[in-house]
Regions:
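Active-/binding-site microenvironments in catalytic and ligand-binding cores
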Residues: 7-275
Length: 275
């Protein structure tokens, strides 16, 4: 599948050539937001000591802060911060599972601003916490809304963000320590790479792989294809299925396997009706 994703496709604009264009478009979109022609939706959870974390990566909460300066002593307030790269709403860079992949600081700016869609599987996930998105889910979405734009970020809404910020409910570990939350099937991920060539995949759970996945098959398939992931995304229920754009801005950490990110959706405002 990775070869297909890296191969030519005349329907797709080369993403890496879009950096300057993306910056120009961002300026234009800023004007539209100020003029009320577009609205912004924040897709980012607040990152603090209450944020859920991967239990196997730390014996306790890995988010730590300490006071560096104070108003009383220094005339200003700053903190020192220690946390894993994959904390809160964050981006997984391709190098996370591909030794030859891009680190988070090397992802082209043009890939951070993209068209986006939301595929809603929340009904299925509500009845099955281990639900994995299927090819059928994607095909049904395409049948209803049309083709997924090439070079898009494809979000999957499972409804899991309703459990944030409870560590117990969000990570949902059983008595054996196995996590239980929805994700993608490897077949669905392969379908996306072959048919849509997305720049990114986003989800409102802790991982694009389901919680009980033992081999991270979706990561291992998509990251060699250059696809980044946005995980722990918020507010997907506030987005339309299609017709909007996303801006994903991770910390530019040198060599980073990922980084916390501010993720925002830009949605065209509904036109006013004049009588």
């Amino acid at each position: 599948m990775a070869d297909v994703a890296k191969g030519g496709n005349r329907r797709c604009v080369t993403v890496t050539k879009g950096c300057d264009l993306a910056l120009n478009v961002a300026d234009q979109l800023g004007d539209k937001v100020r003029e009320g022609k577009m609205r912004l939706v924040d897709l980012t959870h607040t990152l603090d000591h209450n944020s859920p974390y991967w239990p196997e990566e730390a014996s306790g909460n890995p988010f730590h802060t300490s006071i560096a300066t104070t108003y009383q002593k220094d005339g200003n307030f700053t903190r020192n911060l220690s946390l894993p790269e994959h904390s809160g709403t964050h981006m997984d860079a391709p190098v996370h599972f591909d030794p030859k992949g891009e680190s988070v600081d090397r992802i082209a700016v043009g890939k951070l601003f993209a068209p986006a869609v939301v595929i809603d599987v929340s009904s299925a996930a509500k009845s099955n916490v281990d639900y994995r998105v299927t090819v059928k889910d994607i095909e049904e979405w395409v049948g209803r809304y049309g083709e997924i734009p090439c070079g898009a970020v494809v979000f999957f809404r499972t409804g899991w963000d309703e459990r944030w910020p409870s560590q117990e409910k969000y990570m949902n570990a059983d008595t054996d320590g196995v996590l239980h939350f929805p994700g993608l099937s490897v077949e669905a991920a392969g379908y996306l790479i072959e048919h849509a060539r997305p720049v990114g995949i986003g989800i409102d759970t802790a991982s694009v792989d389901s919680g009980r996945s033992a081999d991270c098959a979706v990561h291992n398939l998509t990251m060699p294809a250059g696809v980044y992931h946005l995980e722990n995304v918020a507010n997907l229920d506030r987005l339309p299925a299609t017709g909007f754009s996303v801006i994903a801005l991770p910390l530019k950490l040198g060599g980073g396997s990922g980084a916390p990110a501010r993720v925002m959706a830009l949605i065209p405002a509904e036109p006013e009706i004049h009588h």
